[in-house]
Amino acid sequence: MIRWLHISDLHFNDDDMSTIFMRDELPKYLKEKDIKCDYIFCTGDIRTANASPNIFQEESVQYLIELCTAVGITTDRLFIVAGNHDVDRNVAGRDEAIRRICFQRNGYYNPKYGKIKEDDLNAIYEGQAEFRKFLSKIYTDDRVSKYSDPLKPHFNIETDDFNVLHIDSTLTYTKEQEAV
């Protein structure tokens, strides 16, 4: 039997007390109940949208490592994908590239062919610079390299138990899509 923990919306850089409380209690609970897992999946929004400063706090790195330790795994069994809050949506050229690609279905992207122009992928990729720095504090260089090719925004990691397809759902997300 495979056991995993799925976490999302950690929202570091946010001072909401309920968010902080839930985050703080999870590792304690896992240790107290001696819950062991084979894998952890972290599906984005590690930080709050367009955090200021636009960085990932060291606390978020330590937290994910602590969760791995609490359930008895190493970080190679932690799988992370960026959420819409984990990218810098204000990077120069990013919004313009997304508009060219697909904004309100007036862009050039056709799902039948699945092609996005290299210049546009590079512009979008710049919004993930801090996310990749964050990952480099958790993963080996080999693992970080999988996140480091703007022309291959999606990738697969094979494990002994299954394959994990990492889908970059932030490719076409703009700051104007943020819920109020």
Regions found by a protein language model. Name each.
Residues V61-A179:
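Extended active-site neighborhood of metal-dependent phosphoesterases/phosphodiesterases
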